[in-house]
């Protein structure tokens, strides 16, 4: 997990508290991710990935939005909704 990182100003416990998921984890950002709400699908380049069982929240490089999506067994992510800030994304889980 050398590439795994927390968002600036956040702790893992705060992420767990806000999301209500005590099993939340920080995942390696080196994985395939795409925005499937557009056609054609847009490739996302994750900077931060937070895992919540079969869901995840992704913050792409050079993008201020947070994308929620499905986390698959192979580690890939399909994102289908976006939030302006992390707090709202966590509450939307």
Please tell me what each predicted stretch does.
Residues 1-48:
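Negatively charged, low-complexity tracts enriched in Asp/Glu with abundant Ser/Thr
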Residues 4, 22, 29, 63-64, ...:
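Short linear motifs in intrinsically disordered/low-complexity regions
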Residues 7-10, 75, 80, 93:
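Aromatic-residue detector
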């Amino acid at each position: 997990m050398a590439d795994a990182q927390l968002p600036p100003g956040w702790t893992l416990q705060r992420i767990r508290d806000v999301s209500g998921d005590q099993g939340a984890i920080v995942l390696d950002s080196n994985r395939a991710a795409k925005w499937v709400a557009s056609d054609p699908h847009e490739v996302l380049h994750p900077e931060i990935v937070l895992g919540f069982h079969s869901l995840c929240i992704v913050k792409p490089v050079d993008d201020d939005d947070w994308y929620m999506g499905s986390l698959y067994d192979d580690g890939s992510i399909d994102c289908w909704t976006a939030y302006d800030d992390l707090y709202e994304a966590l509450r939307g889980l």
